[in-house]
Amino acid sequence: IYCTPAHQYPLGVPMSLPRRMALLAEAERHGAWILEDDYDGEYQYDQRPLPALQGLDSQGRVIYVGTFSKVLFGSLRLAYLVLPRPLMEAFSRARAAFDGHSNQLQQAVTADFIRAGHFATHLRQSRLLYQSRRDLLLSELAEHCPELNPIHSGAGLQCAVLLPPGGEGRWTQAANALGLGLRPLGQFYLGEPRLEGWLLGFGCLDNQTLRQLCRRLGALMRTASDGLMDAADRDKP
């Protein structure tokens, strides 16, 4: 069972504690393994993070997956597993068979970075930085894009916003024509989309750029809405 309980992508909703306990019970009942991908688990803003499934697991059914690439830098390419003890030998053999040339220098430097307390300091600072950017994004959207309804997940480096029904296609096309590069939520559905909106990333944007983009988006949406209203008026008998 693969899951991202800390922060579901793309809507960002965390898995509730009752659902986590129910999932663990189902895994135990069926003898299944849970692969817990701690996606964006480091960036929780509005409340204390819930315990990981791995920390709640008393039966050894959870394989916990984490990475340093997102919280430090992408080219680090250093990840890790927290395994139930009975799986250690099998995973070690598989790891050696697939890739026996890990960068030992990167691992040693990262371990020293953690032991010295620098990693914890970096996480605190980056969490505050990204929370301030998230808060600014929500404030600017409320002012300039009142048509958008943000999903307040309280986590991650992106924010999903919902559009009025029927608006995703026309507004996305207009925004992309201006170079805004918005990702519609409809792209994430295997079947028929049930929600319309966008996924807005803010992790790499400074405050000035965030303000500028929100104002451009607001102006675009007002222009598109006015154009639709004019077209509707022309179609009236």
Residue positions per predicted region:
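PLP-dependent class I/II
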Residues: 2-237
